[in-house]
């Protein structure tokens, strides 16, 4: 998101826009993993397209978005246990 555009089209406090984006994406099964990165266990690309279509209908979003991308994760590896086995606490 372009912050100056968010301030212009969404208003202040503009950071509430991120909460609204999250709520919309949750309707389609997305969950936030880090910052503005969202994942979904549903591999149906039509679901992704519907989410993007819904976001595009939000005027302040369409006017403020800097970059939006989608990709399919073919094989997801979780290395948390590998790292945590050396933890001291």
Curated annotation (Swiss-Prot):
Q: Which InterPro entries match?
A: VapD, Virulence_VapD/CRISPR_Cas2
According to its UniProt record, the EC number is 3.1.-.-
The record's Pfam families line, in alphabetical order, gives: CRISPR_Cas2 (PF09827)
Per UniProt, the keywords (alphabetical) are: Hydrolase, Nuclease, Plasmid, Virulence
**Coiled-coil annotated spans:** none
Domain of life, source organism: Bacteria
State if ATP-binding is listed as a keyword.
Answer: no
Name the Gene Ontology molecular function terms of this record.
nuclease activity; RNA binding
Entry function: Cleaves ssRNA, mostly between U:A.
State the protein's name.
Endoribonuclease VapD 1
């Amino acid at each position: 998101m372009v912050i100056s555009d968010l301030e212009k089209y969404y208003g202040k406090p503009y950071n509430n826009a991120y909460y609204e984006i999250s709520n919309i994406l949750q309707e389609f099964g997305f969950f936030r993993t880090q910052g503005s990165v969202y994942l979904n266990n549903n591999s149906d690309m039509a679901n992704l397209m519907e989410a993007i279509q819904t976001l595009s209908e939000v005027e302040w979003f369409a006017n403020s978005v800097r970059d939006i991308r989608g990709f399919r994760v073919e094989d997801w590896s979780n290395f948390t246990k590998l790292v945590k086995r050396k933890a001291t606490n």
